[in-house]
């Protein structure tokens, strides 16, 4: 009969392959409840971290000195020969008593069974009380796996029932560097209490929250909403969706249209492109768009205008039909990758006036669609059947022979239309060769004289789509990497899981391609920045672009190392870990680059013209007088934006990383003149206006400017010209005097007006934190919060000095001091959050302080109202 409740140590890592099996790591200590449980030879029933399950016995080692009887089954290792006796030591026990309780004898430690405690002196020796009745702990394990010798503590204990850890005073002798734990008598069962540090090593441990929780404004206060599960889809703006009761794909029909009509259609949904001259197996067509768009049509009809950059189809021969076509579209959009529905949200927009009639559009996808959202493991790989962008449309013969291609609207900023010989023209989106890719990349960095930037709205949408693509592909790669590490398919080359390996390699390529697409967009924007009125914009954007290029090169290097290691004989688990660690930071880098482009979009791209384009517009990208859609891109260049702070120099705080945090401190309670002077200086600093505005989203600019005006408005302190809204009623006997009542009512109105400004500033601050804006953004908003609250402190200071009633002075002074303390806390936490960005804990602490400030200001207003009504 096997003994129960034996403590064992894990010799290797173990990954559970069934719900009944336990996962553990090397070095974990667990309780063996039963050996060879339920007739399963070699499987033991164990308990670890409060969970029970079966584990392979050959991955455990029974610890020393547990029981005084020999187990029924064989031990986990071969029996070792007894050690030779030494002078002054007890002889080892015979094999018949392998499990024996520890006796007060001397224990000779072995090299691998000694716990060293780095205690510098004897003064630091201490005793630690074990909570509750002590279990039978094991002594340090020996190299032998089945022979357990008697052990004797070197230091005597006053009582065998006392559960104390004896901490050795320091290195002195071989027997002093051991944890000696006396046995406990009378225990019916053993309980192993896992230290908290060991709990953190468990794979089931909880992870710290990676997202800052921002309270929601309810009335005049802020409360936290219930936690909502994270959404796995991208929200498409409502104004971009075509009207319809079902909100599904609006795909124009293809049957019954003449070729001339079909060529003028404008799609915002990538249709199914050409299958190729010989067709394809229908089982290989995995699309997320109804496939009947391209069925039954000759290839010549697929030359509509897209809002998504087309790419060269892998099924179409790379012949002269496509060599003469020139687009100003970055070539990275054509790189073939496995299609990920979550990465490419379909954005629909209303068709222009020259699109086909309304009766030719239906809201319901055609029946009998192909496979939708097929899991990656079930997809059949092919050279040209999996796409992340639509295929290239085939040109009609008259266009391929040298005709002018109809102009289109592309969601990528084209730097210029260049006059180049036919052999030097770049393909629309071909990046299959390194020479072609480098040629297109270099051409994007130099803008020619005929530069015509992209429209502002289209560029912003394309930038958001590219950023979302990077985030989605990285998330997909991390999921696959977790699956590969959990199943062990990547570390066990003897039994590889080919579908998972192929999906992992495809996900790595998808991440690299998504980052490359964003880089191509940014390179085009760099070319546009060279022609803007802001001369420093080109240098700033180039620095941001260089950081992203370094990230891309690192990803490519890790991906190549991963592929090379997989093909060779060496283990590649380390390569996979390095790639995953590098990929985790990619979404944040992409977000910073996209945020910078968003903030300067008004300078880099053309503003949308309000009126319909007419023939008197400027030059077009495709100078064809008969082309009806050529006037779409005839837009004048935008005028440079006007900044509200005209006195601040352009280069202020540009060369100093800490400049934007200078002067950001709250000192003592100031007087009125000093406060207004400091407030004016802070508002004129470029650290608030220019450095903050340069990275704000477009929809936040108006809110930022409105807050500037509200915060800069001084406090009205002229009581002579003030008239109360209602006549002052006589107070109760013993109440406030008329002068104090008038003073309270006057400053109560000032307090309510400034509370509105403070509430708006807090809302804008929470929005910046919730959208994970960089420090320069939320620090600028926190200054608005501090300046608005500082006005309330000034009101309280004025009342405490001018009021005659002692009760009024004491209460107002109390809340003024409270607001001062809260402002100091906000300054400290904001600095910490900026220096530790993007730490969620530091940002959450900052949010809590601002939320507490909002509640305290509301209490201050209520106290003023109660005092005025007394």
From Swiss-Prot:
SMART domains the record matches: SH3
Function field: Docking protein which plays a central coordinating role for tyrosine kinase-based signaling related to cell adhesion. Implicated in induction of cell migration and cell branching. Involved in the BCAR3-mediated inhibition of TGFB signaling.
Residue numbers carrying Phosphotyrosine: 128, 234, 249, 362, 372, 410
UniProt key word Cytoplasm: yes
Domain characteristics, as noted in the entry: Contains a central domain (substrate domain) containing multiple potential SH2-binding sites and a C-terminal domain containing a divergent helix-loop-helix (HLH) motif. The SH2-binding sites putatively bind CRK, NCK and ABL1 SH2 domains. The HLH motif is absolutely required for the induction of pseudohyphal growth in yeast and mediates heterodimerization with NEDD9.
Composition skew (Basic and acidic residues), residue ranges: 416-426
Region (Substrate for kinases): 115-416
Residue numbers bearing the Phosphoserine modification: 134, 139, 292, 428, 437, 639
Domain SH3: 3-65
Ranges of compositional bias, category Low complexity: 427-444
Protein name from the UniProt record: Breast cancer anti-estrogen resistance protein 1
One GO cellular component, as annotated: actin cytoskeleton
Species of the source: Homo sapiens
Subcellular location per the Swiss-Prot or TrEMBL entry: Cell junction, Focal adhesion; Cytoplasm; Cell projection, Axon
Gene Ontology molecular function terms on file: protein kinase binding; SH3 domain binding
InterPro entries per UniProt: BCAR1_C, BCAR1_SH3, CAS_C, CAS_fam, Serine_rich_dom, Serine_rich_sf, SH3-like_dom_sf, SH3_domain
Region ranges (Divergent helix-loop-helix motif): 746-796
